[in-house]
Amino acid sequence: MLSGKKVLITGASSGIGKAISQALLAEGAHVIGLCRSIENLSEGVTPLACDLTVPAEIESAFASLASLDALDVLINNAGIAYLSPITTGDPAQWDRMWKVNVNALGLCSQHALKLFPKSGGHILNISSLSGHRVPPTGGFYAATKFAVRAITDALRAELKLAKSSTRVSSISPGFVDTPLLDQYFEGREDQLSKTRAEVNMLTTKDIAATALHIINSPAGVEINDVQMRSTDQSV
């Protein structure tokens, strides 16, 4: 079903984004990777360099896609995470998380809608269980993921009002063993080691398989949100 489909993935150079891009390539999709580190993209992915903290670069990147007949799927995967408490956190980290996790997701969605075919496209947002419950000391990261959840629901409602056939979905994973997790626990490596010892974490391939299931859902079916955790992650 994905053969020949044009799929744009943000943050496709590592972690979940890279795993999804590889799974899509195996299905015959035309994958476009929008990220800063294009040298780390998987072979076969069309590179599209962009700093997602800069709105003008996002606009320019999507303008360069105007030559495509249409874009079929947008996967908003890019994200950053800092364990930055409200009481003592660094406002510069808050600002960066908000720019990438929230603003860029909204802007990419806005631009992608203009490239979707009249029959509708599909937007898949990679969120987090932190968008459903707030972990201790991770309040501001959770705030960005609650915002992603709100944007996902709001966009779906807007498109229904507009009688659009575009589908909007999200995946909210628990712990996934990626470089993002190392970034999140920076300075608290002992805590991360303890978590890794106690929890059999999800893999990037787990998320990729779920993403393909959502994108391949039958016409007329919209999977709204999939919450995922390993069987031994309690919360």
Where are these regions (language model features)?
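Conserved glycine-rich cofactor-binding loop
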Residues: 13-14
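Substrate-binding pocket helix/loop in short-chain dehydrogenase/reductase
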Residues: 85-86, 90-96
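Conserved glycine-rich Rossmann-like NAD(P)H-binding loop of the short-chain dehydrogenase/reductase
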Residues: 27-41
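The beta1-alpha1 cofactor-binding region of Rossmann-like NAD(H)/NADP(H)-dependent oxidoreductases
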Residues: 50-60, 91
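C-terminal helical subdomain
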Residues: 166, 170-171, 190-235
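Active-site helix of classical SDR
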Residues: 109, 144
